[in-house]
């Protein structure tokens, strides 16, 4: 079962990715993790990636695709894999297809921008433990304080409204066109495209995923 997750930052992909990995026994492939692992291992591709990153440049699509191919050939991907955060653009999706990396399901988590902003800017984190709260959806017992230690909670830089809105603009410009791309791929019978209402509760989304993936 080879799956691509699509959806804006804050659409709930991370939570559901965890569920899919555990339920279906397939690993999540993150291009960031893959790049770090290749650099650390000092593989041929890792050396190339390191040279590009050290020069302050973005790693090319070709190199990322080569890393994905190398990664999915490993034993733990025998039953499939879950791609989140890649492909981000239509050229990357085309390159994946040309490299013979086929996908069974493309799952789009659809959530309106304003709800995403609401979800993200309300997050509060306890730095010591990583415990996450939300001022509206999961508030601490005492406002601004961690339930366990009573220490102050903080807002991550990434969770500030200006940053969130920037990331959403980037998503709509770069990644949203993939929705049309994979819709056409599904019509051609090359994959199954499923749009999931990400505004539902975590459990409802989970039930829908089980229904789709079997």
Swiss-Prot record:
Residue sites binding AMP per the record: 31, 36, 57-59, 85-88, 92, 156, 167
Which residues are ATP-binding?
10-15, 123, 132-133, 200
Subcellular localization(s) per the UniProt record: Cytoplasm
Per the UniProt record, which EC number(s) apply here? 2.7.4.3
Give the metabolic or biological pathway.
Answer: Purine metabolism; AMP biosynthesis via salvage pathway; AMP from ADP: step 1/1
User: Could you tell me which residues belong to the region NMP?
Assistant: 30-59
The answer to whether the entry has keyword Nucleotide-binding is yes
Q: Which Pfam families match?
A: ADK, ADK_lid
Q: Which PROSITE patterns match?
A: ADENYLATE_KINASE
InterPro entries reported for this sequence: Adenyl_kin_sub, Adenylat/UMP-CMP_kin, Adenylat_kinase_CS, Adenylate_kinase_lid-dom, P-loop_NTPase
Signal sequence span is: none
Indicate the family of this protein. Answer: Belongs to the adenylate kinase family.
What this chain does, per the record? Catalyzes the reversible transfer of the terminal phosphate group between ATP and AMP. Plays an important role in cellular energy homeostasis and in adenine nucleotide metabolism.
Q: How does it assemble?
A: Monomer.
Protein's UniProt name? Adenylate kinase
Q: Which gene encodes it?
A: adk
């Amino acid at each position: 079962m080879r799956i691509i997750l699509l959806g804006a930052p804050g659409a709930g992909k991370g939570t559901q990715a965890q569920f899919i990995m555990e339920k279906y026994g397939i690993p999540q492939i993150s291009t960031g993790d893959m790049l770090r692992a290749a650099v650390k291992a000092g593989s041929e591709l890792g050396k190339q990636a390191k040279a590009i990153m050290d020069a302050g440049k973005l790693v090319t699509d070709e190199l990322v695709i080569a890393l994905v191919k190398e990664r999915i050939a490993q034993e733990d991907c025998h039953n499939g894999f879950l791609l989140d955060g890649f492909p981000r653009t239509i050229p990357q999706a085309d390159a994946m297809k040309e490299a013979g990396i086929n996908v069974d399901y493309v799952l789009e988590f659809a959530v309106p921008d304003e709800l995403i902003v609401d979800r993200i800017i309300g997050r509060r984190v306890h730095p010591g433990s990583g415990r996450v709260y939300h001022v509206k959806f999961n508030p601490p017992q005492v406002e601004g304080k961690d339930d366990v230690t009573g220490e102050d909670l903080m807002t991550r830089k990434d969770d500030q409204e200006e940053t969130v809105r920037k990331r959403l603009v980037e998503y709509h410009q770069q990644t949203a066109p993939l929705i049309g791309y994979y819709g056409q791929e599904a019509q051609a019978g090359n994959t199954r495209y499923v749009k999931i209402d990400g505004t539902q509760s975590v459990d409802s989304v989970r039930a829908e995923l089980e229904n789709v993936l079997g």
